[in-house]
C-alpha cells in the first residue's frame, strides 16, 4: 500500500543493536503510517473507484463507522422486510381466494404484491445478516445475485404501477375500448411483458455493461453508479430514462386525462337534470375514481420512496461521487426497499372489497381492521355483466329488468366489466338505435328502457324489445 516516496525504515537498520531512532525519523514513520491508514479507509469506503474494484472483493472491505449504525440499519431493514412479506402475502392470499377480486385489473395488483413480496424476501434477510457482522458475508456471487434481485423486482414494481395507471385511464376515459381488451389472457401477456422488460434491464451488468458491487456501508450491493466511465454512465443514464422517468411521465399523462374525463363527465351529467340516471352515472364514475385514487396513492408513495436513492445515483452519475458518504448511500437504499410495504397497508385502509375479503377469510385480521365478517358479505358482490347478455338478440327487457344486484362472490365470465364499462356499452348501443343517452337507466345488471310515444299513449307497462347486437368476439 505504501508508495515509493513514503518514508521507510530499512530492515538492516532496525536489526542493528546500535541503531537509535531520532525524533525526526519517528515522525516520518508516523506520517507514513497515517498515510497508509487513510488510503486503506478510502479503499474500503469507495470500492467502486476505477482500478480498485477487483481489490475490493478479496477480502470484502469494511467501513469505519460506529457499530450502532450497522445495527440500526439492520433492525430497520428487518422490520421492513417482515412487514413487506406478511403484508404482501396477505394481499396475494386474499385476492386469489376471493372470486370477486380475481379480475383482470386486480391481476396487476397481485403482480405488484408478488414483486414486493420477493423484494422483501430476497433483500431484508441478507441485509440484516451482513449488518450484524458489519461486512458483506456472501461473496462476489452473492453480491451479484442480491443486486440482481433488487433490480428485477424494483423494475417490475415500477412498470406494474405504470400498467395500473394505464388501466385506470382506459376504463375511465375509453370504457368501450376496454370491453374486448381487458381479458385475463391479455392481462397475463401484459404481465409477461413486464417481467421480460425488467430482466432486459437487469441482466447487462452480468455481461460487462456496468457491474453489481457493494455500496454504502458495504453490507448491501447495487449496480455501479459511481465509476465515471462512458460505459457505466451510459447504462445508468438509459436505466433512469426507461425505468424511472419514462414510466413516471406515462403515469402523469394518464392521471391528467383521468381528471379531465371526470370533470367533463360531471358537466355532461348536469345536463341530464335531477334524474336517477344522473345520480347512478355519477356514483359509478365516483367508484372508478376512488379506485384510481387508491392506485395514485400507491404510485406516489413508490416514487417518493425511490426518489432519494435515485438522487444519490444521479449524483454519482454526474461525477460527484466523492461527496457521497456511506450513510448517504445506505439510508436511501433502505427507504427504497421500504416501498414494498406501502401496497398492502394502503389497500387494507382504503379498498372496501379487500377489507371485506380479509374479514371473511382472515377473521382475526379483520377484527384488527375493524371490519365485521357478517356485515362484509354483501359488499363482496361482484357487479358485472356477461358479454352474452348484450350480444344475445333474443334477450328481452323484461328479463333484464328482473336482474337485481348480484350478492355472489363473482362472475365466472372471463371479462369482468366495471360499472362504467357496462354503462358505456349500453349507452353506445342506445345511441346506435337512435335513443338519447340520458334516457336509459342501467344499474348493476338492471336495465330500464325508455318507452316510445306510442307506448306512452297506450301506457303498456312492459314491452319486449331486443337489445342492440354486439359482436360476441369483443
Curated annotation (Swiss-Prot):
<dbReference type="GO" id="GO:0071482">
    <property type="term" value="P:cellular response to light stimulus"/>
</dbReference>
<dbReference type="GO" id="GO:0060041">
    <property type="term" value="P:retina development in camera-type eye"/>
</dbReference>
<feature type="transmembrane region" description="Helical; Name=7">
    <location>
        <begin position="356"/>
        <end position="372"/>
    </location>
</feature>
<dbReference type="GO" id="GO:0007602">
    <property type="term" value="P:phototransduction"/>
</dbReference>
<feature type="topological domain" description="Cytoplasmic">
    <location>
        <begin position="260"/>
        <end position="293"/>
    </location>
</feature>
<dbReference type="GO" id="GO:0007186">
    <property type="term" value="P:G protein-coupled receptor signaling pathway"/>
</dbReference>
<keyword id="KW-0812">Transmembrane</keyword>
<dbReference type="InterPro" id="IPR027430">
    <property type="entry name" value="Retinal_BS"/>
</dbReference>
<feature type="topological domain" description="Extracellular">
    <location>
        <begin position="210"/>
        <end position="238"/>
    </location>
</feature>
<dbReference type="GO" id="GO:0043204">
    <property type="term" value="C:perikaryon"/>
</dbReference>
<feature type="topological domain" description="Extracellular">
    <location>
        <begin position="1"/>
        <end position="72"/>
    </location>
</feature>
<feature type="topological domain" description="Extracellular">
    <location>
        <begin position="129"/>
        <end position="144"/>
    </location>
</feature>
<keyword id="KW-1015">Disulfide bond</keyword>
<feature type="region of interest" description="Disordered">
    <location>
        <begin position="428"/>
        <end position="474"/>
    </location>
</feature>
<feature type="transmembrane region" description="Helical; Name=4">
    <location>
        <begin position="189"/>
        <end position="209"/>
    </location>
</feature>
<keyword id="KW-0090">Biological rhythms</keyword>
<dbReference type="GO" id="GO:0008020">
    <property type="term" value="F:G protein-coupled photoreceptor activity"/>
</dbReference>
<feature type="topological domain" description="Cytoplasmic">
    <location>
        <begin position="166"/>
        <end position="188"/>
    </location>
</feature>
<dbReference type="InterPro" id="IPR050125">
    <property type="entry name" value="GPCR_opsins"/>
</dbReference>
<keyword id="KW-0297">G-protein coupled receptor</keyword>
<comment type="similarity">
    <text>Belongs to the G-protein coupled receptor 1 family. Opsin subfamily.</text>
</comment>
<dbReference type="Pfam" id="PF00001">
    <property type="entry name" value="7tm_1"/>
</dbReference>
<feature type="transmembrane region" description="Helical; Name=6">
    <location>
        <begin position="294"/>
        <end position="314"/>
    </location>
</feature>
<keyword id="KW-0675">Receptor</keyword>
<dbReference type="GO" id="GO:0007634">
    <property type="term" value="P:optokinetic behavior"/>
</dbReference>
<dbReference type="GO" id="GO:0043052">
    <property type="term" value="P:thermotaxis"/>
</dbReference>
<dbReference type="InterPro" id="IPR017452">
    <property type="entry name" value="GPCR_Rhodpsn_7TM"/>
</dbReference>
<keyword id="KW-0472">Membrane</keyword>
<keyword id="KW-0600">Photoreceptor protein</keyword>
<feature type="disulfide bond">
    <location>
        <begin position="143"/>
        <end position="221"/>
    </location>
</feature>
<feature type="transmembrane region" description="Helical; Name=3">
    <location>
        <begin position="145"/>
        <end position="165"/>
    </location>
</feature>
<feature type="topological domain" description="Cytoplasmic">
    <location>
        <begin position="94"/>
        <end position="107"/>
    </location>
</feature>
<dbReference type="InterPro" id="IPR001760">
    <property type="entry name" value="Opsin"/>
</dbReference>
<dbReference type="InterPro" id="IPR000276">
    <property type="entry name" value="GPCR_Rhodpsn"/>
</dbReference>
<feature type="glycosylation site" description="N-linked (GlcNAc...) asparagine">
    <location>
        <position position="31"/>
    </location>
</feature>
<dbReference type="GO" id="GO:0005502">
    <property type="term" value="F:11-cis retinal binding"/>
</dbReference>
<dbReference type="GO" id="GO:1990913">
    <property type="term" value="C:sperm head plasma membrane"/>
</dbReference>
<feature type="topological domain" description="Cytoplasmic">
    <location>
        <begin position="373"/>
        <end position="474"/>
    </location>
</feature>
<feature type="glycosylation site" description="N-linked (GlcNAc...) asparagine">
    <location>
        <position position="35"/>
    </location>
</feature>
<keyword id="KW-0966">Cell projection</keyword>
<feature type="transmembrane region" description="Helical; Name=2">
    <location>
        <begin position="108"/>
        <end position="128"/>
    </location>
</feature>
<dbReference type="GO" id="GO:1990384">
    <property type="term" value="P:hyaloid vascular plexus regression"/>
</dbReference>
Amino acid at each position: 500500500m505504501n508508495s515509493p516516496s513514503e518514508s521507510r525504515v530499512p530492515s538492516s537498520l532496525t536489526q542493528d543493536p546500535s541503531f537509535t531512532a531520532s525524533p525526526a525519523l519517528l515522525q516520518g514513520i508516523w506520517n507514513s503510517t497515517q498515510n497508509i491508514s487513510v488510503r486503506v479507509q478510502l479503499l474500503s469506503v469507495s470500492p467502486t473507484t476505477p482500478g480498485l474494484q477487483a481489490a475490493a472483493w478479496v477480502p470484502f472491505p469494511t467501513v469505519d463507522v460506529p457499530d450502532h449504525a450497522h445495527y440500526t440499519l439492520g433492525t430497520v431493514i428487518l422490520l421492513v422486510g417482515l412487514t413487506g412479506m406478511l403484508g404482501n402475502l396477505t394481499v396475494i392470499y386474499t385476492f386469489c381466494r376471493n372470486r370477486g377480486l380475481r379480475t383482470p385489473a386486480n391481476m396487476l395488483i397481485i403482480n405488484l404484491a408478488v414483486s414486493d413480496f420477493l423484494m422483501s424476501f430476497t433483500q431484508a434477510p441478507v441485509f440484516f445478516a451482513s449488518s450484524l457482522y458489519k461486512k458483506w458475508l456472501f461473496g462476489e456471487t452473492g453480491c451479484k445475485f442480491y443486486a440482481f434481485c433488487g433490480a428485477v423486482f424494483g423494475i417490475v414494481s415500477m412498470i406494474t404501477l405504470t400498467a395500473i395507471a394505464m388501466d385506470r385511464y382506459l376504463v375511465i376515459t375509453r370504457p368501450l375500448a376496454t370491453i374486448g381488451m381487458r381479458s385475463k389472457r391479455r392481462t397475463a401477456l401484459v404481465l409477461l411483458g413486464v417481467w421480460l422488460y425488467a430482466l432486459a434491464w437487469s441482466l447487462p451488468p452480468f455481461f460487462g455493461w456496468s457491474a453489481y458491487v457493494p455500496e454504502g456501508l458495504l453490507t448491501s450491493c447495487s449496480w455501479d453508479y459511481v465509476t465515471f466511465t462512458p460505459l457505466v454512465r451510459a447504462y445508468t443514464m438509459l436505466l433512469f430514462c426507461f425505468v424511472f422517468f419514462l414510466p413516471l411521465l406515462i403515469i402523469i399523462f394518464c392521471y391528467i386525462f383521468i381528471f379531465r374525463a371526470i370533470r367533463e363527465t360531471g358537466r355532461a351529467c348536469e345536463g341530464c337534470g335531477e334524474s336517477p340516471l344522473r345520480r347512478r352515472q355519477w356514483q359509478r364514475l365516483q367508484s372508478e375514481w376512488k379506485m384510481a385514487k387508491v392506485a395514485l396513492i400507491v404510485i406516489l408513495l413508490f416514487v417518493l420512496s425511490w426518489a432519494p436513492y435515485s438522487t444519490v445515483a444521479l449524483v454519482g452519475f454526474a461525477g460527484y461521487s466523492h461527496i457521497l458518504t456511506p450513510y448517504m448511500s445506505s439510508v436511501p437504499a433502505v427507504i427504497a426497499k421500504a416501498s414494498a410495504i406501502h401496497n398492502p397497508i394502503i389497500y387494507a385502509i382504503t379498498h372496501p372489497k379487500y377489507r371485506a375479503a380479509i374479514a371473511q377469510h382472515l377473521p382475526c385480521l379483520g377484527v384488527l381492521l375493524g371490519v365485521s365478517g357478517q356485515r362484509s358479505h354483501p359488499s363482496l358482490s361482484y357487479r358485472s355483466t356477461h358479454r352474452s347478455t348484450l350480444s344475445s338478440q333474443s334477450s328481452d327487457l323484461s328479463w333484464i329488468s328482473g336482474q337485481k344486484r348480484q350478492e355472489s362472490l363473482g362472475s365466472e365470465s372471463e371479462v369482468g366489466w366495471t360499472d362504467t364499462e357496462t354503462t358505456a356499452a349500453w349507452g353506445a348501443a342506445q345511441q346506435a338505435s337512435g335513443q338519447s343517452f340520458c334516457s336509459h337507466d342501467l344499474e348493476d345488471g338492471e336495465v330500464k328502457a325508455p318507452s316510445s310515444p306510442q307506448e306512452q299513449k297506450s301506457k303498456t307497462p312492459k314491452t319486449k324489445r331486443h337489445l342492440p347486437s354486439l359482436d360476441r368476439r369483443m
